[in-house]
């Protein structure tokens, strides 16, 4: 069964491109274009991992990630952003960071790295 990702980004072009790329990599993908919609999807669906853009109108990704970690601490969250320096506070509760300027495959690789131990634990 494919792992389910929640991808959150207010940049609709990047949202579409990454949705397609992640599906091509074999993941089931839920998408949201803002923090409020993301938290609703997160509360209503099983999610193996969330990818959250940092800068979004209304609610930045750090607050979205913190709320996700509060609701379900075991779900990994990756910040995907053009911001190269994140506050230590943000780094303390997220599971990874990938720059939007990186090749899209960098995000796919980071997701795989984080989920691999979880796959092994489920299989064993």
Where are these regions (language model features)?
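Receiver (REC) domain active-site loop signature in two-component systems and cognate sites
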Residues: 56
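Acidic catalytic/metal-coordinating carboxylates
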Residues: 34, 60-64
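Acidic, metal-coordinating helix/loop segments flanking the phosphotransfer/catalytic sites
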Residues: 31-49
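Active-site residues of response regulator receiver
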Residues: 53
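Conserved phosphotransfer cores of two-component systems
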Residues: 43-45, 68-74, 92
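Conserved acidic segment of CheY-like receiver
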Residues: 2-13, 18-22, 50
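Output/docking surface of receiver
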Residues: 93-114
């Amino acid at each position: 069964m494919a792992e389910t990702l929640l991808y959150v980004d207010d940049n609709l072009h990047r949202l579409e491109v990454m949705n397609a790329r992640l599906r091509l990599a074999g993941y089931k993908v839920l998408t949201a274009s803002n923090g409020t919609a993301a938290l609703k999807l997160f509360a209503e669906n099983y999610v193996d991992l969330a990818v959250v853009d940092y800068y979004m109108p209304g609610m930045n990704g750090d607050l979205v990630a913190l709320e996700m970690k509060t609701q379900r601490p075991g779900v990994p969250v990756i910040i995907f952003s053009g911001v190269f320096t994140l506050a230590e506070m943000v780094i303390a509760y997220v599971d990874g960071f990938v720059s939007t300027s990186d090749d899209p495959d960098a995000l796919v690789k980071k997701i795989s790295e984080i989920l691999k131990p979880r796959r092994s634990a489920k299989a064993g």
